[in-house]
Curated annotation (Swiss-Prot):
One of its GO terms (molecular function) is exopolyphosphatase activity. One of its GO terms (cellular component) is cytoplasm. It holds the Pfam family SurE. Gene3D superfamilies: Survival protein SurE-like phosphatase/nucleotidase. It comes from Methylobacterium sp. (strain 4-46). It is found in: Cytoplasm. The keyword Cytoplasm applies. Its cofactor is a divalent metal cation. Its EC number is 3.1.3.5. Transmembrane segments: none annotated. The keyword Plastid does not apply. This is 5'-nucleotidase SurE.
Length: 253
């Protein structure tokens, strides 16, 4: 099995190294095509107004000055064009990609692009807690990653479907199994703008998230990782809402 690995945190990210090790536990034919720099939050964007710069890092490792979607296209359509990958793995992201995160995530977009190109694709992310970005339990994704991927592949991924996997913020032995769950939704009142002033008196802004208690919905990715379970969520490329389609057809047709 030929595996193409990408991410959105960049070619030097620790999570990419973790995913390479996971991939090599599944196959000895692993190729890495990842962004030259951190592309977190770029979602499914493409570089349409700038050229893609390709740098060979090692025999089967490449860096692209572009987005995760650019990287997957470069891998499938150029680097591996003679024989394409059988599987695209995107991650392991530093931080969870659950609920509405999936609409912003470059990690999920890497798997989405693989799916568009007809390749089975899985996005993987490692949640972290109060300790912050400097205290990510990569060992949890490392320990459970290969087995989780194998089980997903054995179950089968249908065309047009990608799989989003989130590992909880706990030690590997504390994981309470796999939960196949729906995409959740947070309280968007927690999203805010943090206004600050620079040394010259000019205002600047950061996106911020307020600290507040929030009860995640039952059967969601948010609830699963809160309960120390590995959240596995199948996502569709087709964003059509069928009930509304039917209702609008009756109301507007």
């Amino acid at each position: 099995m030929r595996i193409l690995v990408t991410n959105d945190d960049g070619i030097h990210a620790p999570g990419l190294k973790v995913l390479e090790e996971i991939a090599r536990g599944l196959s000895d034919d692993v190729w890495v095509v990842a962004p030259e720099t951190d592309q977190s939050g770029v979602s499914h964007s493409l570089s349409l107004n700038d050229p893609l710069r390709l740098r060979k890092v090692a025999e089967t490792r490449f860096a692209v000055k572009g987005t995760p979607s650019d990287c997957v296209i470069m891998g499938v359509r150029h680097i591996l064009k003679e024989r394409g990958p059988d599987l695209v793995l995107s991650g392991v992201n530093r931080g969870q990609n659950v609920a509405e995160d999936v609409t912003y995530s470059g990690t999920v977009a890497g798997a989405m692009e693989g799916t568009i190109l007809g390749v089975r694709s899985i996005a993987l992310s490692q949640a972290y807690g109060a300790g912050g970005r400097a205290h990510v339990k990569w060992q949890t994704a490392s320990h459970h990653g290969a087995r989780t991927i194998r089980r997903i592949l054995e179950a089968g991924i249908e065309p047009g479907i990608l799989v989003n996997v989130n590992f909880p913020d706990c030690e590997p032995e504390a994981v309470e199994g796999i939960a196949v769950v729906a995409q959740g939704m947070r309280n968007q009142q927690l999203l805010a703008i943090d206004e600050r002033v620079d040394g010259r008196g000019n205002p600047y802004f950061w996106l911020a998230f307020a600290k507040a208690r929030f009860e995640p919905g039952h059967g969601t990715d948010l609830k699963a990782i809160a309960e120390n379970r590995i959240a596995v969520t199948p996502l569709r490329l087709d964003l059509t809402d069928e009930p509304t389609l039917t209702r609008f057809a009756q109301a507007l047709g």
